Structure formats: C-alpha cells, structure tokens
C-alpha cells in the first residue's frame, strides 16, 4: 500500500472505532501516521465485545501490527479479561512452564498437573517483596505466561543484569505457528541508575550466543536495543513492501523447513506470509536461529545449512534497519497486542535479579493461534485443538461466555 492508501485506510478504521466504541475514543500513532503501531484510548477491554467490535479490533491489528490500549488496569481488572480478549484473536495456548510434569506428559502422556501453589510463578512473584507487589487475579491460568524479574529476587539479594535475546516471533517452530500475542502490564522499572541514565547498561550476550560469522552490520542491528525495559519490535510487512517487485516475487517462492531438533524431518512453511483477510504480505520470522541452540536452525528448502544462514542473515539485516524499528515503552495498565506474522520482537537487556520493587518488571502474556473468532465461545473442533494446542486447552467457559 502507498502512504496515501495507508492514511486513508487508517481514517476509515478510526471512524469505525468511534462508531462502535463511542465518540470519546481516539487513536494516536506510536511512531508516525504511515508507520506501524497505534495507541487506542477510550476502549474498556473488561467489557464483552460484540461481534462487530471484535472484528474491528482484529482489523486494527491487521492494519497496524501493534495496538496498545492504555488504562485497563482498574481495581476490577482480572486476567480472565485478557484471556477472553485473546480468544477473539485465536485459541490461547497454555505455557509449558506452568505445569509440574510437562515433559513426562509429552513423553509418556501422564495426566497433566499444574505446579503446586508455592512453586507457581505468581506465588514466587508475591514472595519477592511481600505487601509491595501482588499479582493480578487469574495469574495462575495455564494460558498466562508471566514475564517478570520477581521470582528469585528480594531485598537482601545482589542485583544481576542479563543480556537481550535473539530477534524472534513467539513459537514459530510449530506447524501452525502463533498468530498473536498480548501483554497486560502491571509494573515497569522506574529506576535509571546505570551510566547514561538508563535502567540497565548495554549488556552484550556472551561469546557464542550468535554465529561467529554473522556479518558486522547485522550484529550491530541485532544488538541495538533499548535499555529501559521496553520491548523492541520491527515491521516485517513494511520491510517486505519496500523490496523491489522482482525480489518480492523471488521470496514468495521460498519455503522454510522448521523443526524442533536437527534430526527431525520438520515441515515446510512459506517465508512470505499472506494475511487471509487483507492480502497484505510480510516476512514471517526470517531469522536463521531465533532460539540459538535451544531450537534447530531454519533451513531454506534446497539450500545447505551455511547457504540458509547467509540467505536469512541478509533478510534479517534488511528487516532490522532503523526505519522499520519501534521500541515500545510499557506503562502500567496497558494491554498491548502484536501480530507475530508481521513483526519480530526482542526482549532487551534487563535486571534479572532485583533488590527493590522499583526495579520490578511484571507483565502477563497470552499467545494464541488459529483463526479469529468474533463471537465467543470459540468453535474450534476437538480434533483441531488436539492436533494444534499442546497440551490441549480451552479457556474456562465462564471466562468467555457473556
């Protein structure tokens, strides 16, 4: 789409937002009028959505890649509200770290069990600074992954800082990859005691974290990360649209073999994703080793491992150019939703162990896959859930029914 077309479509969506949610709603760019990301004021996501409202929110995400709703964290907010919202965008997936015996379940199909309450992440968060920070109700849902530095922290402990991660999308290494992820933000760090006035110093990964032959320009872009607890994003739809048409056509023919382990046969999936609702194209997770050594590197069909790495490194360098980048500043009470098909993101350097509540980073993430559902409860078949949600999971009925 041209800049004029993007602006025109934005105006149409903004008008529809006011019609469906009220004239007090307003939209502001996170970057610029022709760039990804919008902050949407005046929408209360604790309320049930009509089918028309849910359809509009999905359309807003399709168009903007990232949408953020401030001031959602009132006294009545619970994480069931976030999980109900997630069900409109896709089927929420449970996080393996919430279970006590997930590995045994995968290998032996023993009955699943959540961790005992004292070992659950929410309990460990509450124990870090008793009385100062308490998790939001519903944090024990299997679908809620708590992104935080509170477990293992406390007033008597030595502060520690960790480096950033690889650029990635959330769980692209399954045959049906995740479509959407979202955060509810409870706490963000407010101290700025590092040299340069940031929350943390620019802490680099240890040697061997990236492939030793990664190009210097790519490494500079990979490591150019924010230092105040933001989440770094880049726009892979805009990056694809800026390529010459001939190059776009070439990349649309590329198939990637993704797999968990090197010995697995894996499966083929297109490098270029086409949004089924808009026709908009984007580069879906064009990263050779987005999980380092934890997940097998991607192979380009018909290329050797080295050629695959060099090919994808070139594309990663393209999408990480500063003109496609956006560092999202989190605020308590925000709900921020992003498309995993049209963005990459990164968790930048952060304090991993803290000794004061002012350094706390506490956010709740839910990710989902499959098609949107404008009415709830979702109508995913048992066979689809069994094949694509591991372990099989549906949100509690009383959370998603009006």
Predicted segment positions?
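Non-heme Fe(II) oxygenase catalytic core, chiefly the N-lobe of the double-stranded beta-helix
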Residues: 2-66, 71-332, 341-402
């Amino acid at each position: 789409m041209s800049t004029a077309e993007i602006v025109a479509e934005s105006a149409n969506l903004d008008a529809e937002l006011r019609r469906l949610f009220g004239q007090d709603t307003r939209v502001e760019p996170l970057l610029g009028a022709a760039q990804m990301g919008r902050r949407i004021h005046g929408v209360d996501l604790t309320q049930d959505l009509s089918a028309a409202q849910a359809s509009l929110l999905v359309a807003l995400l399709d168009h903007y890649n990232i949408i953020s709703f401030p001031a959602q964290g009132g006294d009545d907010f619970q994480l069931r509200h976030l999980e109900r919202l997630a069900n409109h965008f896709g089927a929420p997936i449970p996080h393996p770290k919430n279970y006590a015996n997930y590995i045994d379940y995968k290998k032996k199909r023993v009955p699943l069990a959540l961790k005992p309450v004292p070992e659950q992440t929410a309990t460990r968060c509450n124990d870090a600074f008793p009385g100062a920070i308490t998790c939001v109700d519903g944090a024990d849902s299997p679908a809620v992954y708590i992104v935080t530095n509170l477990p293992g922290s406390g007033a008597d402990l030595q502060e520690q800082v960790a480096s950033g991660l690889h650029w990635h999308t959330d769980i692209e290494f399954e045959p049906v990859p995740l479509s959407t992820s979202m955060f509810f933000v409870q706490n963000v760090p407010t101290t700025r005691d590092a040299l340069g006035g940031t929350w943390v110093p620019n802490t680099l990964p240890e040697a061997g974290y990236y492939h030793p032959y990664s190009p210097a320009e790519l490494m500079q872009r990979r490591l150019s990360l924010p230092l105040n607890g933001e989440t770094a994003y880049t726009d892979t739809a805009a990056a694809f649209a800026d390529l010459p048409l001939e190059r776009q056509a070439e990349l649309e023919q590329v198939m990637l073999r993704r797999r968990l382990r090197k010995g697995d046969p894996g499966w083929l999936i297109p490098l270029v994703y086409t949004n089924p609702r808009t026709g908009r194209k984007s580069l879906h997770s064009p990263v050779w080793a987005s999980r380092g050594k934890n997940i097998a590197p991607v192979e380009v069909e018909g290329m050797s491992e080295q050629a695959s790495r060099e090919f994808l490194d070139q594309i990663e360098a393209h999408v990480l150019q500063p003109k496609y980048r956006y560092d999202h500043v989190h605020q308590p009470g925000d709900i921020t939703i992003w498309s995993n098909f049209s963005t990459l993101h990164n968790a930048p350097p952060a304090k991993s162990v803290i000794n004061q509540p002012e350094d706390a980073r506490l956010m709740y993430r839910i990710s989902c896959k499959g098609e949107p559902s404008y009415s709830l409860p979702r109508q995913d078949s048992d066979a689809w859930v069994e094949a694509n949600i591991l372990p099989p999971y549906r949100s509690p009925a009383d959370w998603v029914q009006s």
